[in-house]
From Swiss-Prot:
Family: Belongs to the NrdR family.
Protein known as: Transcriptional repressor NrdR
UniProt keyword annotation of Membrane present: no
The protein's role, per its UniProt record: Negatively regulates transcription of bacterial ribonucleotide reductase nrd genes and operons by binding to NrdR-boxes.
BP terms from Gene Ontology: negative regulation of DNA-templated transcription
Pfam families: ATP-cone, Zn_ribbon_NrdR
Gene that specifies this protein: nrdR
Keyword NAD appears in the UniProt entry: no
Length: 149
């Protein structure tokens, strides 16, 4: 690790601790040349699978798109940002856990619906109505009935 103050290459770690639910390590370092202290963060570089769209196109996983869909569904609902972030991390972990290089967009949609069902039933119905393209009020009623079981 290069010192950001003097660019020396010799540093020592003074303190290490886990942050971000154990997905990142925060390290306090001290330069052996100039004695300045600085903080670094370490995390594993995890590759997300490509997404196979319903029309057959393949595109890179877009975390902003996933996040936007969740936040849109939860708009004006009493769910904290921390819970939304936890849901996003859960979805991404499930996608990586498949071990696949490519996953169908349908799988991502189902993971999102599973998380929304736990977070907020109204947000779940909002998302499901768009994701499953509800055509009439009857389909809404059927989905609500499934939730009540």
């Amino acid at each position: 690790m290069h010192c950001p103050f003097c660019s020396a290459t010799d540093t020592k770690v003074i303190d290490s601790r886990l942050v971000s639910d154990g997905h990142q390590v925060r390290r306090r370092r001290q330069c052996l040349a100039c004695s300045e202290r600085f903080t670094t963060f370490e995390s594993a570089e995890l590759v997300m699978p490509k997404v196979i769209k319903s029309n057959g196109n393949r595109e890179p996983f877009d975390e902003d798109k996933l996040s936007g869909g969740l936040y849109r569904s939860l708009e004006k609902r009493p769910v904290s940002a921390d819970l939304v972030e936890l849901a996003l991390n859960t979805i991404k972990s499930k996608l990586r856990a498949t071990g696949e290089r490519e996953v169908p967009s349908e799988m991502i949609g189902n993971f999102v619906m599973d998380q929304l069902k736990e977070l907020d039933k109204v947000a779940y119905i909002r998302f499901a109505s768009v994701y499953r393209s509800f055509e009439d009020i009857k389909e809404f009623g059927e989905e609500i009935a499934k939730l009540e079981k």
